[in-house]
Every structure is written in structure tokens, then in C-alpha cells.
Curated annotation (Swiss-Prot):
Keywords: Cytoplasm, Glycosyltransferase, Purine salvage, Transferase. GO terms for molecular function: adenine phosphoribosyltransferase activity. This is Adenine phosphoribosyltransferase. It comes from Shewanella amazonensis (strain ATCC BAA-1098 / SB2B). GO terms for biological process: adenine salvage; AMP salvage; purine ribonucleoside salvage.
Amino acid sequence: MNTDSLALIKQSIKTIPDYPKAGIMFRDVTSLLEDHTAYQTAMKLLVERYKDSGFTKVVGTESRGFLFGAPLALELGVGFVPVRKPGKLPRETISESYELEYGHDTLEIHVDAIKAGDKVLVIDDLLATGGTIEATVKLIRRLGGDVAHAAFVISLPDLGGEKRLQAMGLEICKLCEFEGD
């Protein structure tokens, strides 16, 4: 990937100290979305990376994964599947719970959104601990989908998400990374 393009993306992401709590350096992807050139560059890089990969579906996680997953699916000519928090999807769903730092959360997917043999790309805005994507991958695999790739705009490698997802057999694509948390 083009070094200048990757630098533009990283520079467009604002860092908010002590948000949402003291000691956290929040990486705000919405500042990238506000910058037409940076957003367009991110999408072009993702399309270029995956245009010949043979995916049949792109799955995005709630909610910022939708902002990258849906336009990517359109450009790749495949369907987009949202993975959402409980009670947000109208048809029959399956769910997967996962652990957070203090508690747990649950994600859902429509049971008919992924067919056996679908080749799926998972995408989200940011990879931290990997819990959200791990739960998403489990949902896809339970429905018979083949998922071996996950894409992110931002990765925080010090939080262990990359290693966690690689242990699940996923190849990781990231447009930028920030050290620390």
C-alpha cells in the first residue's frame, strides 16, 4: 500500500486523551470520515486490497464497521451483512456473547444472511482486544461461512487483538496502527 496514502489516513485520525475514561487514548475514526480525501483514500486502499479476493459477502460490525463495510461491499459487487447488538435485527437471528474488560456483550446476525460456503470478509473501524471480531467470526462460522480475512482502519497492536485473531486463522489487514492503548 502507498506510504503517502497510509500516512494521510493516520494523520486524519484525531486522538482524544482520557476518553471515555482517564488513561485511555481514544482514536476517533469519525475525524477520518469528516475528511473526504482521507475517507476516499481509505476506501480505495481497501478496494484495491480485496478486489480480486473472491468474497461473496462483507460483514461489518455495529456500528462504525458499517461505514467501511457497506461501501466496500458495493465496490466489490457483493452483499453487505450487518452484525448488530441484540434486538436491532428484524428477522430470525443467532447470537454470540463475548467478554469485555468489565462485563460482557452480545452480537447478532440474521440466520439467513450467510449461506454455507460464502467467502466472507469481516471489517470494523478499529481492532483493540479482538473480542468483537472473534464473536462475529464465530457467528459467521456457525452459519457455514468461510472467514479467513479481517480488515480494520486502525489497529492497536499492544492490546493483543491481532494475535488473538491470528490464532483463529485470520489474516489481518490494517491501514494504520497506534502504539499503546
